[in-house]
Amino acid sequence: MSAILPTPFPYRLTLGPALLLTLLLATIQPAGAQGPNFTLPGLDDQPVRLADFRGRWVVVNFWATWCAPCLLEMPELQTFHEAHGARAAVIGINFENLAPAEIRSFAKRLAITFPVVLSGGHPIPGFELKGLPTTFLVSPAGELVDTHLGTVNAAMLTARLDELEKTAGSLR
């Protein structure tokens, strides 16, 4: 083998840093760049756009009817929605390929009044799922600022929102 490659592969040292730089540049968004966005069908067949909620915090929660932890947090999301409607919106994204009527009936049984949209079980660019439930927090400017895998409750969401608003206020 030494006759074919008498010296170590010459690009080995430069490939690593170049690849790292390429990956870092790919993840950097220019100043003023918008975060993730989606337009998905709601339970009433009307499109729901994340961009329509700009100016408020948005709690984006991915869930499924078969997910026990998801069902445990639904009343908490509803409580948060009722308490913080002017300050923050909640959008539930059902991550299953079920008929809208099934999800509509399910949401009605749970007394959910926040918007529920249907992903058809397809991933949504900008929202990386590693399991269910997963909750994302989107800033009033439309930037993804937090991700939580596992259940959340109204107190957790309120505390996180207070913390982010306090931090944002101190930066001004």
Feature map (PLM): residue ranges:
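N-terminal "domain-start" segment that seeds a small globular fold
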Residues: L25-L50
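N-terminal secretory signal peptides that target proteins for export/translocation
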Residues: M1-Y11
